[in-house]
Structures are given as structure tokens and as C-alpha cells.
A protein has these predicted regions:
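RNA/tRNA-interacting regions in translation and RNA-turnover enzymes
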Residues: 1-225
Length: 225
């Protein structure tokens, strides 16, 4: 799991698309993008084998993370078993553990140890030595991607994320897609206008090339997909 690069302005987005088109050549015409809010929480990696959750870890340094399987099993949003027809034999699901703003306020009122913000509360709750303590904390999970999915059938990130939703894995209700930079900017403006009413903290948006084959061709530049 790698960290994401930053684009701060509309010109940054346009320059990003220009670099993509230069790299992809004729394949770079009409690039479609998927957009999701970046939740301010703790990034985790879940591994399912034959539909069963077998391990979970934090992002750590991008290569090695802290194993938190027992604590992850206490979070209601994360299914212990995915029991649907044609469930892949191996799935790597990436997402964010977080706490809503309202739940954070309630937790701080009832706790002797005050947390500075919802992100710290989520991280501290997830890293408890005793899973029973974690189980009492109001932690949530939303997936923001995937690694290996054996036998993957979908050609786009958007469609694969909708498949995760069918498997009862939570995804962002604000996920969207666009085939233009102007469309990305419009979606950004719309989400910013709603930000105060989003029940959890976000610290930006993530734009991804929607076509998974193009993603594979583009690979990674430094630490930025």
C-alpha cells in the first residue's frame, strides 16, 4: 500500500492528465477517472481466502504493517465471510478505519483519556492490545481500493468497487466518475459544498484512472499511483 501524490489546483490536474496522455499515446484519449473522498482515518489491508477473512494489517511503511486481525474482527462493517457465488479464492481489500464526528464526541465525553481528533481515536482504538476494548469503540470501515483479486472479472475500478459493495464490503457513497478534468472539478466543488454534512472527516479527494489495464501500464512513479 503506497501513499498518494497531491494535486492542489485545476492546473495540477490538467498537467497530470497531460503526462498521462503523453505516456499512454493513443490509449490516452478519453481517459475516464474515478473519484472518492479521502477519509481521514487509518489505512488497513484485509486478506480474504476462499471468502474468509484471514488477516489484516495497517499500512505501516507501505511494505510492512502492524498485524491487527483480532481487532479488525470486532468491527461490524467488515464481514468475516463473503459467501456469494463465484467469490474469488484470494482477495486483498484496502480501506480506511475511522470514527464519525458524532461518535468521537460521545466517546470523548465518556472516556477518561481524551483524544485530539477522530483519526487519533480510531487509530488508538484499533491498536488496543485487548480486542474487547476495540469492540466497544464505534469504529467504521470504508474500502478505497483493492490489490490482488484472483480471477477478477471487471475491467474498471468503478465496476470492481461496485462488486465489492455486492459482497457487503462498504464503499464510499460519494464515489463518482468522469471523463474530463472539468467534470473532476465539478465533482470536487460539489463534495466541498457538502463537506460540513459528511459524517466523518475527509482531507481531500482521490482521483484514479478508471481503466484497470491502463492503471497497470501506468504503474507507480515514486510513491504515487
Amino acid at each position: 500500500m503506497l501513499s498518494l501524490d497531491n494535486a492542489m489546483t485545476a492546473d495540477d490536474l490538467k498537467n497530470f492528465e497531460k503526462r498521462l496522455r503523453n505516456f499512454l499515446g493513443s490509449s490516452g484519449n478519453n481517459i475516464e477517472y474515478c473519484i472518492e473522498p479521502k477519509i481521514d482515518g487509518l489505512s488497513v489491508n484485509l486478506i480474504y481466502e476462499n471468502g474468509k477473512l484471514v488477516s489484516a494489517a495497517t499500512r505501516g511503511n507501505g511494505k510492512v504493517g502492524e498485524v491487527i486481525t483480532s481487532n479488525i474482527r470486532t468491527i461490524n462493517d467488515i464481514p468475516e465471510k463473503i459467501d456469494f457465488k463465484n467469490t474469488p479464492s484470494l482477495m486483498e481489500i484496502r480501506g480506511e478505519i475511522f470514527m464519525t464526528k458524532d461518535d468521537f464526541v460521545v466517546l470523548n465525553k465518556s472516556s477518561n483519556n481524551q483524544f485530539a481528533n477522530p483519526r487519533n481515536a480510531a487509530a488508538g482504538s484499533l491498536r488496543q492490545i485487548d480486542p474487547k476494548v476495540t469492540a466497544k469503540r464505534p469504529l467504521k470501515f470504508i474500502s478505497h481500493g483493492f490489490g490482488q483479486i484472483r480471477g477478477r472479472k471487471h475491467e474498471t475500478y468503478y465496476d470492481q468497487m461496485l462488486q465489492l459493495k455486492k459482497w457487503k464490503i462498504p464503499i464510499s457513497p460519494l464515489m463518482n466518475k468522469s471523463n474530463s478534468i472539468d467534470g473532476l472539478i465539478d465533482i470536487y466543488s460539489d463534495i466541498v459544498s457538502k463537506r460540513a454534512n459528511i459524517p466523518y472527516d475527509i482531507d481531500g479527494l482521490v482521483y484514479k484512472v478508471n481503466n484497470l489495464s491502463l492503471q497497470d501500464r501506468l504503474g507507480f512513479v515514486g510513491k504515487a499511483p
